[in-house]
Amino acid sequence: MAKKIIGFIKLQVPAGKANPSPPIGPALGQRGLNIMEFCKAFNAQTQGVEPGMPIPVVITAFADKSFTFVMKTPPATYLIKKHSGVTKGSPKPHTDKVGKLTRAQAEEIAKLKAPDLTAADLDAAVRTIAGSARSMGITVEGL
């Protein structure tokens, strides 16, 4: 018989830097889960990823105090900022432009984000990424 699920916990944790301090400790502690076990497992799985890159993770908590977790791809905004070389988006995205993103860079981001996007094909995924970039005040060339 399947284990009884008591809840889902969604967090964004920097790759390789999971520790029991907030927000991880309180979120897992409320449900009685082993915080250090999660931290060690998460850090082990994110060893090959750029340190500090935010990784969304969905933790499934079970009634017997065990858990499983699924890592998602990094947020599109983080990848867009990294590829365009800006530190933050524009406060007025449609009037003040802060950076540029080429179609090739948008395709690279779309390929990386493909498992988490609902787009039917690569072109639709590229348009999704381009829309996110435009809403941050970043010009997308080639679209």
UniProtKB/Swiss-Prot annotation:
GO terms for molecular function: large ribosomal subunit rRNA binding; structural constituent of ribosome. InterPro entries: Ribosomal_uL11 (IPR000911), Ribosomal_uL11_bac-typ (IPR006519), Ribosomal_uL11_C (IPR020783), Ribosomal_uL11_C_sf (IPR036769), Ribosomal_uL11_CS (IPR020785), Ribosomal_uL11_N (IPR020784), Ribosomal_uL11_N_sf (IPR036796). The gene is rplK. Forms part of the ribosomal stalk which helps the ribosome interact with GTP-bound translation factors. Belongs to the universal ribosomal protein uL11 family. This is Large ribosomal subunit protein uL11. One or more lysine residues are methylated. Part of the ribosomal stalk of the 50S ribosomal subunit. Interacts with L10 and the large rRNA to form the base of the stalk. L10 forms an elongated spine to which L12 dimers bind in a sequential fashion forming a multimeric L10(L12)X complex.
